[in-house]
């Protein structure tokens, strides 16, 4: 058995004949296809529905010094979220795709929705505000995907929903800064 130094081993390895190795590089891209757009729309619809539930439960349970104004605002918010959910879902159907048939399927389309876990008004409304902003960013992404796919109806409705969500976040931020 021969003992070699590390330098000898490396030199032998460098001088050894080599074979050309072909490596395939796998690149994952988001193609602008109707299927991918619909997948994104169903996920966004799920998010809107869960946002509707969150706003509705906050509407019932929030207790704060400006309860009447917050209660009224949240009532309008959950109604808007439901209308936005309906709009996106109808657009999915207009593209000849199906929406999930049950609540489990709908919630599986967006699994990591941040839930309010406290009855503290400030904490609950702060999380809801963050969820509004996250939803608005999802709507922006949907606008871009719709533009790439050539779906101007989806693009326009998603832009409108984006505005609704950012406006709601702005109003809540102003409320949270002011009096709670």
Where are these regions (language model features)?
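Short linear clamp-binding motif
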Residues: 1-17
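Acidic, proline-/serine-/threonine-rich low-complexity intrinsically disordered repeat tracts
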Residues: 14-32
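Disorder-to-helix initiation segments
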Residues: 27-44, 114, 121, 125-128
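Helix-loop segments that flank and shape redox-cofactor active sites
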Residues: 33, 50-76, 138, 142-153
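A structural signal for well-ordered alpha-helices, especially hydrophobic packing surfaces
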Residues: 45, 52-55, 59, 85, ...
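Acidic/histidine-rich alpha-helical segments that form the ligand environment
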Residues: 58, 104, 108-160
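Conserved alpha-helical segments that form or flank metal/cofactor-binding pockets of metalloenzymes
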Residues: 68-105
């Amino acid at each position: 058995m021969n003992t070699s130094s590390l330098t000898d081993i490396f030199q032998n390895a460098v001088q050894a004949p080599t074979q050309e190795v072909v490596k395939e590089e796998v690149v994952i891209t988001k193609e602008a296809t109707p299927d991918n757009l619909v997948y994104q729309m169903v996920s966004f619809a799920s998010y809107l529905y869960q946002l509707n539930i969150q706003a509705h439960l906050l509407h019932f349970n929030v207790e704060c010094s400006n309860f009447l104004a917050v209660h009224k605002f949240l009532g309008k918010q959950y109604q808007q979220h439901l209308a936005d959910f309906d709009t996106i879902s109808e657009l999915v159907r207009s593209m000849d795709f199906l929406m999930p048939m049950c609540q489990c399927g709908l919630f599986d389309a967006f699994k990591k929705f941040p839930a309010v876990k406290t009855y503290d008004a400030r904490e609950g409304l702060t999380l809801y505000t963050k969820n509004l902003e996250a939803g608005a960013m999802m709507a922006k992404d949907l606008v871009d995907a719709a533009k790439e796919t050539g779906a101007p109806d989806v693009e326009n409705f998603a832009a409108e929903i984006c505005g609704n969500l950012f406006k709601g976040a702005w109003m809540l931020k102003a409320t949270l800064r002011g009096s709670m």
